[in-house]
């Protein structure tokens, strides 16, 4: 038997250390949390993504009693894909809000969202992932970094 160690590089920033482009996405993601419909979890997730063509899309999680809701990340991703099919996603910012404040630690996307974004990376274009907490912000170079043992071929 052999053992393999898998690591992921995460860069940690404060808001003031971000580029203006990254700040814009974080601000839009924070605003998007207020569009969340989350009466069951009371956990609002907002996302903002930028395409390579400069277009920006926002999304917020939408719940329902059947638990077949959609996450904020995928809401933004699918809206962008419907309007601009084939245009690569450059970066996405994600943040969460609960109990009347933004979460302290950055929130990572669920497995379904990770897989969805990986599908959009199949064109060989990594998507920068910005996870914004109240003060701390994590940045990853690609969604592949969130799922090192992922599958993208069927």
Q: Which positions does each model-derived feature cover?
A:
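C-terminal binding/interaction regions
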Residues: 1-35, 84-154
């Amino acid at each position: 038997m052999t053992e393999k160690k898998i690591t992921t590089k995460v860069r940690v920033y404060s808001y003031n250390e971000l580029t203006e482009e990254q700040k814009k996405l974080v601000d839009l993601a924070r605003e998007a949390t207020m569009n969340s419909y989350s009466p069951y979890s009371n956990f609002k997730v907002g996302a903002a993504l930028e395409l390579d063509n400069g277009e920006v899309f926002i999304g917020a999680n939408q719940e329902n009693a059947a638990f077949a809701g959609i996450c904020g990340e995928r809401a933004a991703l699918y809206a962008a894909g419907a309007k601009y099919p084939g245009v690569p996603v450059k970066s996405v910012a994600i943040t969460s809000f609960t109990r009347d404040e933004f979460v302290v630690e950055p929130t990572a996307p669920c497995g379904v969202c990770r897989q969805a974004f990986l599908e959009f990376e199949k064109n060989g274009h990594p998507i920068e992932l910005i996870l914004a907490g109240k003060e701390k912000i994590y940045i990853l170079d690609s969604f592949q970094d969130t799922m090192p043992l992922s599958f993208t071929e069927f």
